[in-house]
Amino acid sequence: MPINAEYLGPGELPQVIPVFPLPGALLLPRGQMPLNIFEPRYLAMVDDALRDGHRLIGMIQPDMSHSRDEARPELFRVGCVGRITQLAESGDGRYILELTGVSRFKVVEEISGLTAYRQCKVDFFPYIDDFTARKGEEAVDREALLEVLTDFLKANNLKVDWEGIESAPNEALVNALAMMSPYGPAEKQAMLEAPDLKTRAEILIAVTEMDLAKKRTSGDPPLQ
């Protein structure tokens, strides 16, 4: 298939993919994630991803709560694979790239010893709906989402491009806000594993409301 062809279903993706464990990183289907790659093993990962033609990297969070080895922590069982859609060389040995999310996956098993970077055998079929853009977005409570976003922005003295937000489809809006949200690995993982867009939006709203309530009670300063 052409290297820029859209993936139409789980069967078009490889069963074994390289994975990049990164705490707090949330990639979602059709979302964009910038990455600054500088470690030798991950530079090799990018080279291999480009060489094999798929240009795929699986983003996944390390599960530190179940890890004894900090150098090679356990992984959460669900991640999201992205395709390298932009790549630039920094001139000092780094890659500056952008991943575009394709589909979530479940880890079947980790494949050990083949490369310096980690690889996993994965299953995309539980997330077959990820291949259908904007699926379920009509069920999202957009009004509630924008209301809590407004409260969050006021509480943290932040500004956004409201014109862009108002024109964004629900899927793009929910996923972008989830990916950019300042919450911890557990909250990010919950949003990743949400069964549908409506539930992801509800989790984001609930977490934000709890964060705002906590700040009002404790008097914490706004985000800088």
Residue ranges and their predicted role:
Residues 1-160, 186, 197-200, 206-224:
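Positively charged
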Residues 165-183:
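Core structural elements
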